[in-house]
Amino acid sequence: YSENPVFDVDKTVADVNIDMVGRVDKKYEDNPNYIYVIGSDRLSTDLHKINENANNTYAGLTLDYKYNDEKDPNRYYFRSDHYNFARLGIPSIFFFNGVHEDYHQPGDTVDKINFDKMQNVGRLIFHTIWDLANRNDRIVVDGKVKAGR
């Protein structure tokens, strides 16, 4: 999309990437009320604050920034769909439940989804997007694009 956009990318305020948000990884087996957040602060501290505020007000999830670390060997920030927007300077946020034993396997079936968790993550995402869409001003881009390849 970013190479052949339907809408001018200069009018794109942010990208929200939702990829695998209904499962629980090993770290959180005893507390599935979490989500990994990647990229929210890389190009816009406003985007990061909006998401934190939405979480504190509406969802109460543990926001884990483990995979947002620039030194993370998984480099998820550079590997998922949102990066095609981020490389153009569009602030991006990526919601991710982490990897599990069925990651990219046929055994990743609907019966393994934690629907209560997914509902709460959806609530967070809704309120983050609601705030982005209803602001009087665009969020400030105050970070620099870094090459990922």
Whereabouts are the PLM-identified features?
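His/Asp/Glu-rich mid-to-C-terminal helical/loop segments that flank catalytic regions of hydrolases
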Residues: 96-149
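Metal-dependent peptidase/peptidase-like ectodomains
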Residues: 1-92
